[in-house]
Amino acid sequence: MASKIGSRRWMLQLIMQLGSVLLTRCPFWGCFSQLMLYAERAEARRKPDIPVPYLYFDMGAAVLCASFMSFGVKRRWFALGAALQLAISTYTAYIGGYVHYGDWLKVRMYSRTVAIIGGFLVLASGAGELYRRKPRSRSLQSTGQVFLGIYLICVAYSLQHSKEDRLAYLNHLPGGELMVQLFFVLYGVLALAFLSGYYVTLAAQILAVLLPPVMLLIDGNVSYWHNTRRVEFWNQMKLLGESVGIFGAAVILATDG
């Protein structure tokens, strides 16, 4: 009996570490995909989302925070720093107005950013640590969960009001309209759980099971988004990487919530 409990605990710790790896490495992929995206825009003489002098500082801060988080050095502080950096970066890009996106694409982009910020706040609370030397900050974790709940509300909203998202689910998932409505209900229920703070571990477990097929069939269908919906290739790759980071945050809450 004791060996079964020990093996189960070891497996949960292994899965939790996997979630931490996916979330803490997310900024590296974000910086790489941004560089590739802005290089493509430079060839077409189009501007990046953030002016170039500030862009280098922004990416430097992201890489610095991601590096320290990855090595586990002052992870809580640098997770908080990563959340702050991402929030400032997104706000700067939004008010800059250098690039104009469709409303449906803005929802896809900014909702994922909100979720990643929430994931970093969960990490900053002390969740996902193998050997916790300090008590966990429940306020930071609750705030991170609220951010994840907001992301799920945005996804549910897009399923009902975004033609692009609805067609992605209708064309690439079996079950047609029934499956779309099922996902809508699931996202809504999970959002309520994260926002209210009740059954968070169970909600995170369901989300961790739900996200991989969605990432593979919806976000991973680059040809649909790039060729049909005219989303820039590296922008879609950035969104896909953020979905992986959100999955990592869900795994952390599912195993250490």
UniProtKB/Swiss-Prot annotation:
Source domain of life: Eukaryota
Function: May activate NF-kappa-B signaling pathways.
Cited InterPro entries: TMEM101
Phylogenetic placement of the source organism: Eukaryota, Metazoa, Chordata, Craniata, Vertebrata
One GO location term (cellular component): membrane
Listed transmembrane segments: 24-40, 52-72, 77-97, 110-130, 139-159, 182-202, 206-226, 233-253
Alphabetical UniProt keywords: Membrane, Transmembrane, Transmembrane helix
Membrane disposition: Multi-pass membrane protein
Location (main, coarse): membrane
Subcellular location: Membrane
Name of this protein: Transmembrane protein 101
Pfam families cross-referenced by the UniProt entry: TMEM101 (PF15111)
